Amino acid sequence: MKRFSFFLAPVSNVVPHKTVGIEQIYNVIRGDYYRAATEELRSLIQGEGVTQRDVQRFKARNFDYATFSGEFSRRREDALLAHSGLLCLDFDHISRWQGGGHLQGVYGLRYALAHDASVDTALLFRSPGGDGLKW
């Protein structure tokens, strides 16, 4: 099983909480664990006078995170203990993405990535803000 480091919020925490696998992350994302923070973030984004910096600060304080590329002793490039064989691509602000079909935005890109036969997809999910994807 491919394993990688999982860190508890805030993002300033550079020591991993534990080592996890794709199935554990999938279960956390699909469950209710981040629902309240996600809803609060999406409300914040819709608010007047909210800056990108406000949004980034909220995410940094309220969401745990993972280093899908491998296991680390600390969150630093030179602290890699074992590579997972995974690579995570982060697509931000894709509400205007248009593919070849009728689907557009996050849902269109998600469909295109999920059906790309040239890449093995381990996990594909919407980012907490709602207008991005993690692949």
Tell me the role of every PLM-derived stretch.
Residues 1-131:
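Signature for HUH/AEP ssDNA processing cores
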